[in-house]
Amino acid sequence: MKPAIFLMLFVAMFLISEGEGFKPKDAPQERSVFSPVVQSCPRCHRRDHFGKCRKLDPCPD
């Protein structure tokens, strides 16, 4: 086989293994620290420094 075929196979395998970067833009987004759109937490929850919603105890009304 020609070396170019091996190179193309390697690139194709790399792209498949790195599939996280090739999601369509309209796909539901995973939680991202760098995401400019921050969804609000439910009532009695606050966002911690990891970006996750945590339930407050006790709940302030």
Curated annotation (Swiss-Prot):
Note the pro-peptide positions: 22-31
Print the miscellaneous field: A synonymy between H.magnifica and R.crispa is controversial.
Assigned protein family? Belongs to the Hau1a/HC18/HC19 family.
Cystine pairings recorded for this chain? 41-53, 44-59
Question: Span of the secretion signal?
Answer: 1-21
State the function annotated in the UniProt record. Toxin that is lethal to crab. Does not produce the typical symptoms associated with sodium channel toxins in crabs, suggesting that it likely does not act on sodium channels.
Alphabetically sorted, this entry's keywords are:
Disulfide bond, Hydroxylation, Nematocyst, Secreted, Signal, Toxin
Q: What is the species of this protein? A: Radianthus crispa
Q: Which cellular compartments is it found in?
A: Secreted; Nematocyst
Q: Give the Hydroxyproline positions (modified residues).
A: 36
Protein name, entry field: U-stichotoxin-Hcr1a
